Amino acid sequence: MLKNKTFKVTWNYISQTTFMYGSKVSFSNGEVTFINPLMPSGLPIHEWLMLKQFSKYKSAPSLPILRRGQHYKLHFDFDATPAGSVYFIIIFYNKNGTKLSTEIVKSNSITIQYPDEAYAYKIKMMNAASTSLIFRCLTITEMTHQYDLEYKSMRVTKIGDDQYGNDMINVIIAEPSDTYPTISNDFLKLFGHVWLVERWMDDNIEGNIKQLKNDLQSQDTLKAINLISYGSKSNVFATYVAQHLGCKVYRTSHEDDDLKGWLTEHVPGNHELKDTNVEVYFKEEQDKHLNYMSRLMNPVRFLDYLDVSKLNGGEVNET
């Protein structure tokens, strides 16, 4: 399989599109630090352009030329304080400079199709009450294969957002599997306000950890977050995310040593993790099928051992 073409876009200097009123901007080791706690929300911090008039901007275009009708995956590598306080806008223009369409990106990644009528585009990095920002790069990857066009990035299904005053959330980390069906919505409703996180191993695990962490931290009304897992890989992932968030994790005793070692080696900040409140609701020695047959059975069955009433403050959602 041919490797997809990837363009790396960086922020190399202060330009006319950089918001500089009261801002402190520094460039070091491939990172840009932007600090301005007084910057109004809704204004662009910086812009990247595909077309520029050199006489006006005194610099070359910073975005690659994209092919019409082609699919691309864009990934934004950055950290904002507070979490969720920076987002991106992709604006497409036709030949006469009229705005054609707009994409608003509030996560780290998005897959787009470059419009057939588009002549140019630009990307704005927007402020939403951010006090500081560390920006590393933007990557634009051309999706050239059918597998890529059906790209399976991390998926978060949200159910029952209005349950329990919206101040408590149960986040179920699905065990990766191409064999077993996904957890049904009817089963998920037992957990009240619940997010189901799937396909977190299909792409950039480090990026998925960061995205999930940011998404949860942006839920300002939450008083409690419970992470729930039920398999060897999901247990490792859930425990790691819970350590970043300082929240409670409910898991089984199963653990994938290879994944645990990989996270320790490849994901930054492993040595700075917070203590996690871990409750093991099922231990491996309890498994009546503890033999080669156990590996053939859907591990979601272990969730039957979890006392759901503990998760929702003593309540069980029976609707």
From Swiss-Prot:
Any keyword Protein transport? yes
Give me the gene this protein comes from: asp3
User: Which InterPro entries would you find in this protein's record?
Assistant: Acessory_Sec_prot_Asp3
Q: Name one GO biological process term.
A: protein transport
Q: What happens when the gene is disrupted?
A: No effect on cell growth, significantly reduces export of the cell wall protein SraP. The small amount that is exported seems to be glycosylated normally.
Q: What is this protein called?
A: Accessory Sec system protein Asp3
Subunit: Part of the accessory SecA2/SecY2 protein translocation apparatus required to export cell wall protein SraP.
Going by the entry's taxonomy, the superkingdom of the source organism is recorded as: Bacteria
Outline what the protein does.
Answer: Part of the accessory SecA2/SecY2 system specifically required to export SraP, a serine-rich repeat cell wall protein encoded upstream in the same operon.
An example of a Pfam family matching this protein is Sec-ASP3
In the record, the note on similarity to other proteins reads:
Belongs to the accessory Sec system protein Asp3 family.
